[in-house]
Amino acid sequence: MTTLPRRILFVDDEEILRDTIEEMLIMLGYDVELARDAKEALEIARKEYFPLIITDLMMPEIDGTQLCKQLREINETAVIYAFSGYLTELDSEQLKDVGFDGHLCKPVKFEVLKHAIEGAFEKIHQRQGRAANTP
């Protein structure tokens, strides 16, 4: 099994939030790429591989659910998390139907983010293992 890059694409239209999350992820030892909207995220994802993508749901032009669908076409094995301050249990089921693997609520605490990222990379390793065992 090859070693996965510790890379995360984080998408949010709020600059202060992007900077804060970037700082947290760097403290956790991850290489972070930031995108300010869905269009920029798609451009980046077409050029580079990210095992984990975290995206805001409410963005101008293309929202997070549409972005998730388009990202799945580019990278079907990535773990994609929704990031929003307006999630309910019903929403989380709908997000899974769209293609999200999980979600984080704003504002996110450092320990919650750390736990979610660790869980995401466990999922990525499991997917990679299943793909390697598929004939």
Predicted features and spans:
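Acidic catalytic/metal-coordinating carboxylates
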Residues: 36-40, 63-67
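Conserved phosphotransfer cores of two-component systems
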Residues: 46-48, 70-78, 98
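Active-site beta3 strand of CheY-like receiver
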Residues: 49-54
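Receiver (REC) domain active-site loop signature in two-component systems and cognate sites
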Residues: 59
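Alpha4 helix (beta4-alpha4-beta5 surface) of REC/receiver domains from two-component response regulators
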Residues: 66, 87-103, 115
